[in-house]
Amino acid sequence: MTEYKLVVVGAVGVGKSALTIQLIQNHFVDEYDPTIEDSYRKQVVIDGETCLLDILDTAGQEEYSAMRDQYMRTGEGFLCVFAINNIKSFEDIHHYREQIKRVKDSEDVPMVLVGNKCALPSRTVDTKQAQDLARSYGIPFIETSAKTRQGVDDAFYTLVREIRKHKEKMSKDGKKKKKSKTKCSIL
């Protein structure tokens, strides 16, 4: 069974834990309890393949930012979460993405942009803004509500699909490099 290491990142209070707990335990946690770091595991079937999701729910608080490099090194894919009623959390996505790329030393890291709290009426981040940002990054965008469960499975499953595509691409690139080495002739 394939295991996928997923990391949920985003600013404080955007609903990272609520999304993760909704996926794992099928219920909404409405009291806010800031996370330092929690790990969850769940077996799921995605596109006919049984797989194990190893999900790291991270701290949004700036005082825990030193821990980020460590979990970013081990993560295979990242849910970059903002709250649709918090423009600052949306603006912070750029910093998380840059840190992930720096730590992974790659421009091509599997990510999904997630706009959480879409059931709330007080939207400050327009859907088109988020779609445009995701398009500029070349990553999928999904709106979610941890409260109603809307888009929750879709967000995590889409990230797994992005990781699969990335692994496929990397193995094809590796094969191309190997093939080109065998075609070299020295005269």
Curated annotation (Swiss-Prot):
A Gene Ontology biological process term: Ras protein signal transduction
Pfam family, one: Ras
Main location: membrane
InterPro entries according to UniProt: P-loop_NTPase, Small_GTP-bd, Small_GTPase, Small_GTPase_Ras-type
Lipid modification (S-farnesyl cysteine), residues: C184
Motif (Effector region): 32-40
Propiece residues: 185-187
Signal peptide: none
Regulation: Alternates between an inactive form bound to GDP and an active form bound to GTP. Activated by a guanine nucleotide-exchange factor (GEF) and inactivated by a GTPase-activating protein (GAP).
GO MF: G protein activity; GDP binding; GTP binding; GTPase activity
GO CC annotations on file: cytoplasm; cytoplasmic side of plasma membrane; plasma membrane
Chain positions recorded as GTP binding sites: 10-18, 29-35, 59-60, 116-119
Membrane topology per record: Lipid-anchor
Gene3D superfamilies, sorted: P-loop containing nucleotide triphosphate hydrolases (3.40.50.300)
This protein's UniProt keywords: Cell membrane, Cytoplasm, GTP-binding, Hydrolase, Lipoprotein, Membrane, Methylation, Nucleotide-binding, Prenylation
EC number: 3.6.5.2
Family according to the record: Belongs to the small GTPase superfamily. Ras family.
The protein's name in its UniProt record: GTPase KRas
Organism: Xenopus laevis
Name of the gene encoding the protein in the UniProt record: kras
